[in-house]
């Protein structure tokens, strides 16, 4: 598998932008919350507060697609990834995998699912055991899960090394003998060794040299295309996310503030925070019209005591009194493409306040409301 056989844009465009309406999500997250306790006092440690790292997150991931998760450092995206793989225990909420809630599953119940949900970590230097050979590292998941591929584990590991662009002769080498990009390829080989259905990639290229990043992204896209793996791709670089992901969710201070398909979000962002993030992405075309850079005032509030109402209001140029008293729901607004959800009382794009008539209601909720109105009309008659 060659790194340069395809560009990232070309590979990403191979995936359809529309899904069959009957397709069930592979992963469904509802109200996912993770609060880390803050301990204080001596000699008895007691909880004096909580860091609200993730605070009520909702999204879905469909088979074979890539969902990008973006936001500033500290927004909760990496914590979300570790919750999905159950490296962290959720405080509240549900994580449904293939329709089964795994948010409270114990180790025995998670055992058959572990092989189907894998993770690629950010730091290729810290995520590989320096005392193990490449062969031992990649075959580790097979040994843990009792899997013996045809021809044996060594043969399969050598095949995986070729798939990720390394030589089968690297089987007996140690991690310190490889560059950062090569180490991340080893991490990719380990993640796909069990042929999972879902991979959570936590900033897989941010620690790599810029010249290597595109090669690793190309590799991940080719793996996704050939093996049909769904990805949750966590990153802060919106340009890379645009190339890799078919849908993108934007997080701010533990909340998803906007989620949409790639083209809809990048071409018509509705949340002010998304608009500000995109304004900072460098333009590749020097002849293109320069978009105005939006500079956010102030610092990100503390996740220990986040603002009331809309969490972005303390830095938002459109904030009004309503933003401090009412938390905006994540809904589809009129004029948005299907599935483009925004949590804002006063969305961008020149629109006015998101009134009730502007909100495109979920069909199921709309039917329930119509039935209720019909029943009221009959009773009045």
Regions found by a protein language model. Name each.
Residues 43-47, 102-118, 144, 150-151, ...:
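ABC ATPase NBD coupling module
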Residues 174-178, 182:
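Conserved ABC ATPase signature
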Residues 85:
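Helix-to-loop junction immediately C-terminal to a conserved catalytic motif
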Residues 10-25, 38-45, 261-377:
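Short catalytic/signature loops enriched in Gly
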Residues 101, 152-169, 278:
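Conserved ABC ATPase "signature" region
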Residues 197-200, 204-208, 212-291:
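P-loop NTP-binding/switch modules centered on Walker-like glycine-rich loops
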Residues 93-101:
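Conserved ABC transporter NBD signature motif
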């Amino acid at each position: 598998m060659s790194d340069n056989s395809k560009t990232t844009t070309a590979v990403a465009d191979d995936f359809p932008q529309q899904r069959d309406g009957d397709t069930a999500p592979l992963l469904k997250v509802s109200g996912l919350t993770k609060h880390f306790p803050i301990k204080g006092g001596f000699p008895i440690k007691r909880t004096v507060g909580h860091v609200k790292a993730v605070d009520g997150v909702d999204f879905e991931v469909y088979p074979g697609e890539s969902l990008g998760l973006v936001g500033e450092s500290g927004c909760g995206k990496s914590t979300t990834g570790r919750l999905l793989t159950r490296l962290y225990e959720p405080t509240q909420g549900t994580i449904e995998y293939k329709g089964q809630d795994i948010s409270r599953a114990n180790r025995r119940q998670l055992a058959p699912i572990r092989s189907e949900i894998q993770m690629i970590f950010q730091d290729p230097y810290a995520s590989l055991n320096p005392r193990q050979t490449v062969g031992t590292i990649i075959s580790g998941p097979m040994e843990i899960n009792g899997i013996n591929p045809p021809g044996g584990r060594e043969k399969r590991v050598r095949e995986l090394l070729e798939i990720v662009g390394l030589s089968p002769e690297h089987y007996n080498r140690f991690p310190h003998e490889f560059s950062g990009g090569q180490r991340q390829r080893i991490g990719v080989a380990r993640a796909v060794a069990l042929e999972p259905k879902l991979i959570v990639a936590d900033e897989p290229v941010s620690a790599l040299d810029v010249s290597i990043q595109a090669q690793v992204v190309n590799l991940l896209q080719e793996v996704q295309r050939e093996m049909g793996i769904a990805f949750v791709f966590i990153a802060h670089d919106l340009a890379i996310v645009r190339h890799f992901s078919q849908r993108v969710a934007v997080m701010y201070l533990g909340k998803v503030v906007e989620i949409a398909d790639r083209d809809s979000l990048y071409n018509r962002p509705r949340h002010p925070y998304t608009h500000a993030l995109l304004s900072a992405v460098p333009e590749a075309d020097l002849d293109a019209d320069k978009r105005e850079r939006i500079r956010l005032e102030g610092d990100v509030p503390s996740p220990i005591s986040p603002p009331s109402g809309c969490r972005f209001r303390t830095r938002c140029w459109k904030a009004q009194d309503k933003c401090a008293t009412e938390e905006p729901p994540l809904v589809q607004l009129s004029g948005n493409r299907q599935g483009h959800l925004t949590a804002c009382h006063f969305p961008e794009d020149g629109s006015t306040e998101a009134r009730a008539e502007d909100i495109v209601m979920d069909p199921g909720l709309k039917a329930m409301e119509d039935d209720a109105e019909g029943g009221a009309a009959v009773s009045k008659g």
